[in-house]
Amino acid sequence: MDSNPLHHSNPPVGSLPLDKVASLPSSPGVYQFKNAQGRVIYIGKAKNLRNRVRSYFRNPQQLFGKTLVMVGKIADIEVIITSSEVEALILENNLIKELKPRYNVNLKDDKTYPYLVITNEPFPRILVTRQVKKDGSTWFGPYTEARQLRSILDFIGSIFPIRSCKLRLSPENISRGKFKVCLDYHIHKCKGPCEGLLTEEEYLLMIVEITRLLKGKTSATIRSLNERMLSFAKELKFEQAAELKTQIDSLKRYAERQKVVTSDTLDRDVFAVASRNDDGCGVVFKIREGKLLGSERLYMNNTEGVSVQDLLARVVERYYLETCNLLPDEIFLQTELPAEEKETLENLLISKISAEGKQKRTIRLTVPIIGEKAHLIQLCRENARHHLEEYLIQKQKRGEALREHSGLIALAELLHLPKTPNRIECFDNSHFHGTDYVSSMVAFVHGKAKKSDYRKFKLKTVQGSDDYAAMHEVLTRRYSGTLSVELPLPDLIVVDGGKGQLSTAVKVLVSLKLDIPVIGLAKRIEEIFTPHTSDPFNLPKTSPALKLIQQLRDEAHRFAVTYHRKLRTERTLETELTTIQGIGEKTAQKLLRHFGSVDLIRTAGVDELRAAAGNKTAALLYRFYHPLEEG
């Protein structure tokens, strides 16, 4: 067995038999990781189940964060083979919704969002519902913005006199005069199809125009209505022509209010995401005919440690799984999707186009770099950040989220950290002329000490007074092996020391393939060192960030010194006991653990000593400390 404490051992991979991984099929499908209690902790999809699952176990030392912890808990795996990647995507989405596994990114369930439906019946109605049924109706949504949905409905109602009643308007019922017109007819909100005052053919013409409008085809709707208006005028049907003229004017005003965002008239969806700690928000801009039709947003949790690419893939896939109609010509993305996710999305879009019975076409996936298109991405990202901030504020008001520590926010800004450092770990060393060398690690979570996560290290490889070697050992032991699984990885590491200590820390993290921000804090003058700058800098004395770092450093120093003094005292006491002939080091340690101090051993009676160490040792001790009582 390798006794070297600096050996970079692989993280544990749970109790999953690896021969089970080797026997998995190479088919597309869904895999479920289970823990020792049989609970599903992660669900994923794959084009090739064996290759995807094997990737978790092939190089476990390259894993980090939540993935590393998850792999350490895998005890079993269950797979479901599907006929295609798209089928696997649909199944994965449904299973995640149902089971809500601990390590999956969870999007807010779309069953809470409303859809707009044009019913499949004579004289169709336009309704708002939260349940999608495959009954031949035409569906639009989901709408995450309730205000946007109300605005659309009000606008449609102001232009097109569509019925709002629940009557069964079959030709037989109408011809028998079964119904009478309601108030909507008298206030010009309905044309009275219930009494046969409007034919079904005329009514369906309005439905066609409404469908175009909901798809963002405002120009096509205006052209169609204009043609009909001119036709009525030629036939001297001036009342009908005037009615259409009013509708056209309203549509033109509506179109003018829509912001033009691209110089061409292509239909596009634009996606961006933002995340902070364990929450995220995805935003999609719906652009039709070059105009911004509206936006939707999807909120996520359990996002900590998940890459932007994976979050974006989750949002885009979920959006097109749930969205009815409105498929664009092109999709703009904040960043490239992982290759397999991109292929799955392309296949999903093809299947949706086929299911709608439309002509086969390719929807392009693009990451704009320059110009007005890149500006759209930037605008979408800013919206995602803004909505996420509002979402977090609301969570705080509801008591669902901790209010962020001002020092943490200041640290994130000053150090340009990728996220708020909600977990910070600080390391310090202590020794006396190279003896009793110890290190301490303290953890602050949400700006407060979490003493259950403190760790102390009795160093094993350091020779003499070598603080760099001490820092190398303690960081290696903390971030490799079982400790790396026991404790979550921090968002920031602080080492007590200057450039040399910081350089040592960076080397250790690089060797362990860990991407964790790290800084050094020099003693006394409070200078902060960062890896990519040669000169240190000072924080203002009033900065909450400086106050927090000082608390961390002082706590790590206190913890290290306390442990060092304890070891040194024990060693001194052990030396006194081991001068007694017949008392070895192990016996001395055992006695100190039992009594707590040499003074208590010195004053103990024979029976107490006998109970702790046996007859022979008790006699030796009593004779040593009570020589005058002999004879």
UniProtKB/Swiss-Prot annotation:
Record localization: Cytoplasm
Keywords: Cytoplasm, DNA damage, DNA excision, DNA repair, Excision nuclease, SOS response
The GIY-YIG domain, residue ranges: 26-105
Ranges where the UVR domain occurs: 219-254
Segments forming a coiled coil: none
Principal location class: cytoplasm
One GO CC term, this protein: cytoplasm
SUPFAM superfamilies: C-terminal UvrC-binding domain of UvrB, GIY-YIG endonuclease, RuvA domain 2-like
Superkingdom of the source species: Bacteria
Gene3D superfamilies (UniProt xref): 5' to 3' exonuclease, C-terminal subdomain, GIY-YIG endonuclease, UVR domain, UvrC, RNAse H endonuclease domain
GO biological process, one term: nucleotide-excision repair
Pfam families hit by this protein: GIY-YIG, HHH_5, UVR, UvrC_RNaseH, UvrC_RNaseH_dom
Single GO molecular function: excinuclease ABC activity
Function of the protein: The UvrABC repair system catalyzes the recognition and processing of DNA lesions. UvrC both incises the 5' and 3' sides of the lesion. The N-terminal half is responsible for the 3' incision and the C-terminal half is responsible for the 5' incision.
Assembly description: Interacts with UvrB in an incision complex.
Family (UniProt): Belongs to the UvrC family.
Record-given protein name: UvrABC system protein C
Native source species: Chlorobium phaeobacteroides (strain DSM 266 / SMG 266 / 2430)
Gene behind this protein: uvrC
